[in-house]
Amino acid sequence: VFTARTGYTGEDGAELLLSADDGQKLWQILLDRGVCPCGLGARDTLRLEAAMHLYGMDMNADTTPFEAGLGWLVHLEMPAEFVGRQALEQAAASGPSKRLVGLKLQGRAIARHDYPVLHNGETVGVVTSGSWSPTLGEAIALAYVPTNLAKIGQELGVEIRGKAQAATVVRRPFYRHP
């Protein structure tokens, strides 16, 4: 068994890597000891509360680390050459035109992937991930908006079922495990 102190939920935990046969045995032992299985929906809600990015939803091959709030991982001051360095240097120099932000929505409506983000009635961005947060008791989302609107406290809207739902840009993560 290989144990990695990693995870994708923002909670304390570990990932276990083992053979399929050993995995089935361990699964049965855990069930016999009262562990309650959960599905991808629970994992994705925890991921969103922790504001952890999901590739293909919150970022893709066209997203720069600076847009996604991951610029702190890019160390252009180091002399190493790597594929994509020139593109990252250009992106860093010009600055992002959009940013990934956290949104809290008023009411119980849930923003979903690809829902339009509105400002003064105009579409200005797009939701990448959204869900009801059982921990916070409110709807939350990640969305890309123009950099000038990516300020904490900025009032925006999300179009949900043809209606504008009020939303506010908030600090991420939405929830941090104490």
Predicted regions and their residues:
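Conserved, structured C-terminal
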Residues: 1-178
